[in-house]
Amino acid sequence: MDITTTKQFDSIINDTEKKAVLIDFWAPWCGPCRMLTPTITSLSKTFPNKVYKVNVDMQKEIAMRFGIRGIPSVKIFKNGDVMETLQGVQPESVYSEKLKYYSN
């Protein structure tokens, strides 16, 4: 669930031809990010191999590449492209519906 290298990140977002993936950009010092963690964990169980996390402190290059300025920031990728960005903490149903929508 945690993305630890740029190579891993690129592999995941570019291997989405038949599926969308949700990436949570977060940091351990961010209170709202910690509040979102149980939701992301639950989503990863509902959508195996479709939900990932990027620690922006550890993966600054990825965060800069996608213009992450505020966290939590959740992006839905498909075919290597950002389909949608959700800022802040949302209900689990919002993330679930977006992931289902872009997976079709």
Predicted features along the sequence, with ranges:
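Short pre-active-site segment immediately N-terminal to redox-active cysteine/selenocysteine motifs
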Residues: 19, 25-29, 70
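A short beta-strand-turn-helix
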Residues: 2-20
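Structural signal for short hydrophobic segments within the conserved structured cores
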Residues: 1, 52, 83-86
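CheY-like receiver
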Residues: 11-12, 62, 98
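Structural micro-motif
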Residues: 66-75
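Non-catalytic, surface beta->alpha helical segment in thiol-disulfide oxidoreductase systems
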Residues: 76-104
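The canonical Cys-X-X-Cys-His
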Residues: 30-33, 74
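Thiol-based oxidoreductase modules, predominantly thioredoxin-like and allied folds used
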Residues: 3-5, 25, 37-61, 68
